[in-house]
Design a protein with these regions (language model features):
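Juxtadomain coupling helices with adjacent low-complexity linkers
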Residues: 132-172
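Amphipathic alpha-helical coiled-coil segments that mediate homodimerization
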Residues: 8-15, 21-44
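A short, aliphatic-rich beta-strand micro-motif
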Residues: 112-119
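Short hydrophobic/aromatic beta-strand element in the GNAT-like acyltransferase core
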Residues: 41, 102, 115, 127
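GAF sensory/regulatory domain recognition
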Residues: 44-64
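Regulatory sensory and allosteric helical modules in signal-transduction proteins
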Residues: 47, 62-97, 106
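Sensory-domain boundary capping and coupling elements
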Residues: 119-132
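Signal-transmission linkers at sensory-effector interfaces
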Residues: 1-18, 168-172
Length: 172
């Protein structure tokens, strides 16, 4: 397979071999997705039961790392986490349908979203999330971002394992 000139997959794969993981990969994905389709907010969340837990945010003041949302039993959770389908919200109505924190999202000037499930062993283990101004994203923007999602599998498995180890240690 020959990489297209605008396909960052090769350089991102090389990033995985570098020291400083997973933060180095997260930052590289933030930059790659900004170049591909643009965004004003980029977050990464891994699945932990009915919750999603944030491991990366391009705007940590508003969306801090380690923040959590209960999303499993929502229409968005049904679509993205259970049915393992990307979500494209083109406008504020889509944002309001998907997220209980839509007021904060809208206050940041954001009105469109792409959520890509990160899939492993038949399950969604996390999501890659890009937000921008209303009507910024179109159908054609989903596939280039989705191609990058498998790069997050090792980092999300590690984050989930670390969270479970912490939970076990707290029970003792």
């Amino acid at each position: 397979m020959t990489a297209r000139p605008d396909d960052p997959t090769g350089s991102l794969l090389a990033t995985l071999a570098e020291a400083g993981q997973p933060e180095r990969l997260y930052k590289a994905l933030e930059e790659a997705t900004r170049s591909l389709v643009g965004h004003k907010l980029f977050t990464l969340l891994y699945v932990d039961g009915q919750d999603v837990a944030r491991v990366y945010s391009s705007r940590p003041a508003e969306y801090p790392i380690s923040g959590r949302k209960t999303m499993g039993e929502t229409p968005w959770g049904e679509l993205v986490l259970k049915r393992r389908q990307p979500f494209l919200g083109r406008d504020r109505q889509g944002i309001r349908w998907a997220f209980f924190d839509h007021v904060l999202i809208e206050s940041m000037g954001l009105g469109s979203v792409i959520n890509i499930p990160v899939l492993y062993d038949g399950q969604a283990i996390g999501t890659m999330n890009l937000l921008d101004v209303e009507h910024h994203y179109a159908d054609a923007d989903v596939a280039p971002v989705a191609r990058l999602a498998p790069l997050l599998i090792p980092a999300f498995l590690e984050a989930r394992a670390a969270a479970r180890a912490t939970d076990r240690n707290q029970i003792r």
